[in-house]
Amino acid sequence: MEGDAVEAIVEESETFIKGKERKTYQRRREGGQEEDACHLPQNQTDGGEVVQDVNSSVQMVMMEQLDPTLLQMKTEVMEGTVAPEAEAAVDDTQIITLQVVNMEEQPINIGELQLVQVPVPVTVPVATTSVEELQGAYENEVSKEGLAESEPMICHTLPLPEGFQVVKVGANGEVETLEQGELPPQEDPSWQKDPDYQPPAKKTKKTKKSKLRYTEEGKDVDVSVYDFEEEQQEGLLSEVNAEKVVGNMKPPKPTKIKKKGVKKTFQCELCSYTCPRRSNLDRHMKSHTDERPHKCHLCGRAFRTVTLLRNHLNTHTGTRPHKCPDCDMAFVTSGELVRHRRYKHTHEKPFKCSMCDYASVEVSKLKRHIRSHTGERPFQCSLCSYASRDTYKLKRHMRTHSGEKPYECYICHARFTQSGTMKMHILQKHTENVAKFHCPHCDTVIARKSDLGVHLRKQHSYIEQGKKCRYCDAVFHERYALIQHQKSHKNEKRFKCDQCDYACRQERHMIMHKRTHTGEKPYACSHCDKTFRQKQLLDMHFKRYHDPNFVPAAFVCSKCGKTFTRRNTMARHADNCAGPDGVEGENGGETKKSKRGRKRKMRSKKEDSSDSENAEPDLDDNEDEEEPAVEIEPEPEPQPVTPAPPPAKKRRGRPPGRTNQPKQNQPTAIIQVEDQNTGAIENIIVEVKKEPDAEPAEGEEEEAQPAATDAPNGDLTPEMILSMMDR
């Protein structure tokens, strides 16, 4: 116990010496020599009683050894007596200067408390008491004698920096904030005369009290800390201590506190780029300019940044500093290494779409995918109306204008505009020279082994969540099985019209079909009053009739020389074309269209005469029977009723002058045939041939024609076939 008390007194003496050394601040400032103004009491330990005068009036708690985030208090207690005006105003209170503490910045590590002592006449025998008894004796002595005669005067040797507040702590623990006018008068510090000194700016503060309780050397100490929350500022807390300030002889500068959780971001004014650092923004701004100050001394190529230049120089020297830890490959840049590991080893896809389940290895591919949701096509061709979602497809499209073919077959040296076309050429034309890798799960044959690995990973890897078919509710855990299942829906006409029997495979076709029922034509021409059901019809109409620069493509039929604006129309015409001299088909037969129409007419006539056919006997079996009487009644003015022809549909490529005109009426005759068994009379219409030059003589009967005249091409007409069937 005695040893602990002695150690406590020795520590208090050492801290008192440190406080006295700061007293020489003003003298060194004025150039004077340092002189000690007080003598430390000597500790005498003679083995018996050890008596020491302890000046243990604690006036201030200095937090010198606290965490660097706390500002330190800098005060100095000087010996002397209080002025008569101040003696009357001092009561049982203590004036303490406290600092601003931001408790939310980071955890606080409470260090040692340094005690600055002022001599008070209290004598305690150290050998027979403890620290607790020492504190009790001090309180009793203070209550008896008071502090009127020996009250120390607190003199701030430094101006209160920003974040400090002076409070008055009463005997019972009351805390009162002192305003500037209530403080004792102080002389102007000498350092304010320094031309380099700048007083700190004052800012509004909010007071918040919090208590810290900690244990130091077995003693519980309750410290009240006042947290003055300032407005949001930038910067970090500077580590300031009393020794550094005294040595530099300059007051501390106000610190800027950055609150936790608030991140400062910088945004580009020309695009939506954001970054957390100013240096990143400056580097990004160079991408909006054509400035390339860093030039390669080997090839003359220039770059925006030094990093890009270094990576380029590695391509000249062959240096690949970034090596893959999973394989033997090395890369020029760290970005290439990261991309390689994600594609080949980790298969990580950190960039995910917020609208669907798509995920990508590269952020550029994610941006391109998002444009498929928004429909944005920012990359426009300068020579035509083509627009693309990414620059790669635009470059590939520009080759159609320039005629460039950068991809060459290594076998036959044929050149292509796209790499995919070249690969397909090699697989189709040079299969004997290409190594084939068969997929063990399906019939796919792949030329390269790396492509086989990609195929296995994408098509046959197990999917935990499973993917649902877009056409039905089936769920599959393998992409290949899902694709094969969806192919079964390919020819299925899932969309059916509710007003007719029309069905189709795609929804857009059903939408266009329903417009035939509603009569809706939403696409109107801006140059005339015509409207259309489809946009492509509107575009075609505009090009043909309103575009002065439009030159229609001419597709010429090789048989008759007709021209068409569409290839499929010309191909359909060529199948039925017989050449410029006739209307027969390619082999001299009838055209497909005429055959189809003739079959339809024959079918309708068969249905009309089905009843009479069932009632007629087989005339071929009754060879011995006599033929029925035949009467010919020529019609003076035959006017057969012919159905009105349907409106001619205007087709592209057909000359406007040619329309479907009905054939001229030929003289006909009606033959009445009476059946002897049933008595039924049937009328048969036959054509009568008349010679234009020779007229029949009087009294001479015209010979009935039991069958119609032959067709111009030598084939039987429907009337001839019906008459033969009746006989």
Swiss-Prot record:
Sumoylated on Lys-74 and Lys-689; sumoylation of CTCF contributes to the repressive function of CTCF on the MYC P2 promoter. The keyword Transcription applies. The modification Phosphoserine is found at residues 402, 609-610, 612. Residues 180-211, 573-677, 689-717 are annotated as: Disordered. There is a cross-link at residue 74 (Glycyl lysine isopeptide (Lys-Gly) (interchain with G-Cter in SUMO)). PANTHER family: GASTRULA ZINC FINGER PROTEIN XLCGF49.1-LIKE-RELATED (PTHR16515:SF49), PR DOMAIN ZINC FINGER PROTEIN (PTHR16515). More than 13'00 CTCF-binding sites in potential insulators were identified in the human genome. Belongs to the CTCF zinc-finger protein family. Interacts with CHD8. Interacts with LLPH. Interacts with CENPE. Interacts with BRD2; promoting BRD2 recruitment to chromatin. This is Transcriptional repressor CTCF. It comes from Homo sapiens (Human). The lineage of its organism: Eukaryota, Metazoa, Chordata, Craniata, Vertebrata.
